[in-house]
Every structure is written in structure tokens, then in C-alpha cells.
């Protein structure tokens, strides 16, 4: 949603530190990428990130022989902060108690921020800029035809590029494919028991579930596997909050809300976030 016109009754809210931290934590909890990737403090002007592309090599030497010199391969990437925002309308009853407003923010906004961040990293949404890495063009492996073989192929490809598969993000659709996978005796391959219904690990790699990991296409992307030690995200500061009581909200498709006329107000949440990764050590998991 977007604000239309120039609001005349807009106020900035300084959230208490504990509330701001809780909102940010909720966003992180709703994002599989934020759970698996490393987090760094990101200055507003951006930061240079050193990515190790190869390790130094040790060699055997004689007792008095000169010791070999080997340098690691390094690549420098610039991580920039891009703004992610959402507006949510509320009824005026929320104004009666500030705590109710905070509760509403905590319950509704972080999930929207986290899911959009995931979907952007996974290529379902266009990157906000050239210094934001995505997995839109990574190597694909079919996990629908032969699920186990597909994961083994992904693990091998990641290893070929110098990574170790240590994290897998599945969409709900991808989880369905895994739950349907059975061995020759019709026993489930990827869950410990039917009662659990969850996929805790695959080939020793931790798994997370995210709606943002599904990208419709030909084929459809059901999830991603990779070496998450080679992925970094950063945030400039906590979630910024503004509200307006007399703006007009354009909901799209000709739908408009007049906040003053309908006894409502709208809250806008923003976060500045960046993402960088060695995309060669990530694979997309697709259907046939």
C-alpha cells in the first residue's frame, strides 16, 4: 500500500527499545534467511564485506626447507542498505491504549517484512538494487521426480563450488513433496514419524520453512539449499514507525481508504536491510 497526497497529521513514534527490539526479533523469526545467514551491523552508508573465495594451502616440507607461502582468495563486495516498508490500517480504537498499538505492530508487521525479504533473496521479487544478491539464477535440481537423488545432487554441486550444505529452506509446497517421498516399503524418507509431520534435517543440513521460498515458474521453485556461512545480512537500525490519521490509502485495483472518513489511522513500518552471498554455493530445489 502507498500513501496518496500529503498527510497533515502524521506523527513519528519513538518506540521503547525493548518494543523495537521485539518487533525486529519477530521479523527475524519470520524470515528463514535471517535465521540461517550471519548478521552484521550495517552502517547507513553501507559496508565492504570480504568474501573468502579460496583457502590457503599447506604443504609438507623438509626439516630445514623453506616454508611455502599461500594466500587465501578474497573478494570484496559492497553491502548497501535498502528500505523495506509496509503500511497497515487500524481502527481508531487502537488509540485508546498505546500497548494495543504495539501488540498490533508486533503481530502484523514483522511477518510482512520478513516474508518479503525472503522472497526477494529467493528471486520471487526483483532485487531493490545491484548490491543486493539474490538466488534467482542459481543452479536448479529437481526434487520431485526423485527427491533423495535431487538433494544428493544439490549437496554435490555445493561441494564442487567449495561449500558445505548446512541449511535448507523449504516452501510449504516443497514440504509437501518431501512428506510424499517414501522408500520401497512405502515408509517416509524425510520424517522420523507420521505424527511429527516435520522435516528437521536433510542429509545433515538444518531445515527451515518459508512461504517466500516458493517462486512460481517453469519449473516452480520449491526451496533452496546452500552453505549459509557464505551469506550475510545486515540492518541499519530497528523498525521505524510513522502513523497518519487523515491520509488516503491506495490499496490498488481502484480500492481507496479515507482514514479520516472511516475513523481509521495507518501505521507505516520501515526497515533498512542488505544481503550479500556467494551465490555459487546455493542451489534451487524445483519440481519436474
Feature names for model-found ranges:
Residues 36-39, 96, 274-276:
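Short beta-strands and strand-coil junctions in structured, solvent-facing domains, enriched
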Residues 2-84, 111, 151, 281-282, ...:
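Assembly/oligomerization interface modules of large self-assembling protein complexes
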Residues 57-61, 97-99, 177-180, 233, ...:
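Short helix/loop capping segments that flank catalytic or ligand/cofactor-binding pockets
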Residues 33, 55-58, 118-126, 163-164, ...:
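Intrinsically disordered or highly flexible coil/loop and linker segments, enriched in small
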Residues 75-78, 85-163, 185, 270, ...:
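Alpha-helical scaffold segments that mediate packing/assembly in large oligomeric complexes
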Residues 55-57, 85, 94, 115, ...:
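Short loop/turn segments at secondary-structure transitions that flank enzyme active sites
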Residues 43, 138-265, 269-271:
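Extended oligomerization regions of viral-like shell subunits
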